[in-house]
């Protein structure tokens, strides 16, 4: 095996790379499609984009369930150990762009890029818990929909506080 992959990390990367790259591309495609909309339209379609995007990501993950179990729980020491953090960075960047475009960010706002990062990390960690707990797809979808309502409601409260 190692003659083909070089070492254990080479084998690991050969297994998880297609899944990791595919999910990242789905996530970026959703972000870019959302941000291509006019700023005043974005808040109106936000919930739909988020729910549809989460469903698409969930189906992608569950179609490659074992790959994502490895990626999430066995990637320490590989180039994929920060995979979730990479998704968080993308979410943070695009959320910040959204808040600037829709003028939710105002001078003196308590909402900082660091706060956005922390909230994005909480969202992704909770999203991937369904994989770590080996939930079946239908149960995972129900949990993700509840989590999304939770995060969406929380953001609504934070934005009102501004």
Predicted regions: what they are:
Residues 41-69:
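Helix-turn-helix/homeodomain-like alpha-helical modules used for DNA recognition
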Residues 63, 93-100, 116-162:
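C-terminal peripheral helix-coil segments that are non-catalytic and often amphipathic
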Residues 3, 10-34, 48, 52-56, ...:
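Alpha-helical structural segments
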Residues 71-88, 142-155:
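C-terminal/domain-terminus segments
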Residues 7-10, 66:
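Residue-level recognition of oxygen-bearing side chains
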Residues 52, 56-63, 76-103, 114-124:
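Amphipathic alpha-helical packing segments from all-alpha helical-bundle domains
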Residues 22-33, 67, 122-130:
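Solvent-exposed, amphipathic alpha-helical segments
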Residues 37-43, 71-78, 107-108:
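Short linear capping/connector segments at secondary-structure termini
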């Amino acid at each position: 095996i190692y003659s083909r992959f070089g070492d254990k990390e080479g084998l690991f990367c050969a297994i998880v790379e297609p899944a990791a790259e595919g999910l990242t591309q789905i996530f970026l495609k959703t972000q870019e499609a959302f941000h291509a909309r006019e700023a005043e339209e974005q808040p109106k379609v936000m919930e739909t984009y988020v729910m549809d995007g989460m469903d698409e990501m969930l189906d992608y993950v569950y179609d490659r369930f074992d790959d994502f179990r490895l990626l999430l729980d066995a990637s320490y020491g590989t180039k994929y150990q920060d995979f979730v953090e990479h998704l968080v960075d993308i979410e943070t960047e695009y959320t910040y762009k959204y808040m600037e475009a829709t003028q939710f960010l105002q001078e003196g706002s308590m909402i900082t890029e660091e706060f956005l990062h922390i909230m994005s990390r909480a969202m992704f960690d909770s999203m991937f818990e369904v994989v770590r707990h080996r939930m079946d797809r239908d149960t995972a979808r129900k949990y993700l929909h509840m989590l999304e309502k939770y995060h969406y409601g929380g953001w609504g409260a934070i934005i009102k506080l501004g």
